């Protein structure tokens, strides 16, 4: 199936929020958004990080317990001699598990290579769609999507400077939304290094790695930074929901164009 896609144009912003140039977007920013594929590929990427777990084959079985038999007025569960304490059976304290987890369990959701590529393209297209970005809950005042800025942004070294850029681009409201919604996690996860639940805010897609910029941007709540060459559905559609508020550098668009354009025919 082939679709007629219209090439979109957009502006490039400087660090003060002024429009400095107009460019044609790669064709994949016009692709239809396949939410079903994005969800499947997100699950696939997410499950790749899961660690297989099992149980000690002898867990709950290190006992000499045997059933006392019948006609004693007792349940016929295995019992420890002399004490009569029930053991070994799944319904007893300290007994074995009836169906323990096994390391052989298949954890990863498998998807085809072309489906994975199409899902990333769909997620990229959603970042250029005002409806998807707003429906995801992001708050911003800018009227142009996707947001593309000059490459000089990666030279910034201070968190304060990056915040000023976000304010000039009229997207800092989304960071404030994240701040207001940070909350303590329920359950035991708060004791295991996952104390706070933090919503996802703006995503920076950059063309080259600059550790100083990455660290400065990561200090801002909800903000993530990723190389265009490493971009995946995990970053573009957290939770499998497309339409993350994304800020691209000018050169990152060229990297994405080389990576995806002309690879798929619809």
Swiss-Prot record:
GO biological-process terms attached to the record: translation
Annotated keywords: Ribonucleoprotein, Ribosomal protein, RNA-binding, rRNA-binding
UniProt keyword Thylakoid present: no
Domain of life according to the entry: Archaea
This protein's GO CC annotations: ribonucleoprotein complex; ribosome
Gene3D superfamilies according to UniProt: 3.40.1370.10
GO molecular function: rRNA binding; structural constituent of ribosome
Membrane spanning stretches: none
Matches recorded under HAMAP family: Ribosomal_uL4_A
Subunit structure: Part of the 50S ribosomal subunit.
Function: One of the primary rRNA binding proteins, this protein initially binds near the 5'-end of the 23S rRNA. It is important during the early stages of 50S assembly. It makes multiple contacts with different domains of the 23S rRNA in the assembled 50S subunit and ribosome. Forms part of the polypeptide exit tunnel.
Family from the record: Belongs to the universal ribosomal protein uL4 family.
Protein name, as recorded: Large ribosomal subunit protein uL4
Gene that encodes it: rpl4
């Amino acid at each position: 199936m082939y679709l007629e896609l219209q090439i979109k144009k957009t502006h490039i912003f400087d660090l003060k929020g002024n429009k400095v140039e107009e460019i044609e977007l790669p064709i994949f920013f016009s692709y239809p958004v396949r939410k079903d594929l994005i969800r499947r590929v997100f699950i696939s990427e997410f499950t790749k990080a899961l660690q297989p777990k099992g149980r000690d084959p002898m867990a709950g079985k290190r006992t000499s317990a045997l059933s006392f038999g019948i006609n004693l007025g007792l349940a016929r569960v295995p019992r420890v001699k002399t004490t009569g304490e029930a053991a070994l059976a799944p319904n007893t304290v300290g007994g074995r598990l009836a169906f323990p987890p096994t390391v052989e369990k298949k954890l990863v959701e498998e998807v085809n290579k072309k489906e994975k590529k199409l899902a990333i393209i769909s997620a990229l297209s959603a970042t250029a769609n005002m409806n998807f970005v707003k429906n995801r809950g992001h708050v911003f005042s800018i009227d142009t999507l996707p947001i593309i800025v000059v490459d000089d942004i990666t030279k910034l070294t201070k968190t304060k400077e990056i915040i000023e850029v976000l304010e000039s681009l009229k997207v800092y409201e989304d960071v404030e939304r994240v701040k207001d919604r940070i909350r303590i996690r329920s359950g035991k996860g708060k004791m295991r290094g996952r104390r706070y639940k933090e919503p996802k805010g703006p995503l920076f897609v950059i063309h080259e790695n600059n550790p100083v910029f990455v660290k400065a941007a990561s200090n801002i709540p909800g903000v993530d930074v990723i190389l265009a060459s490493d971009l995946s559905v995990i970053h573009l559609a957290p939770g499998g929901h497309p339409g993350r508020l994304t800020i691209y550098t000018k050169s990152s668009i060229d990297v994405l164009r080389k990576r995806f354009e002309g690879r798929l025919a619809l």
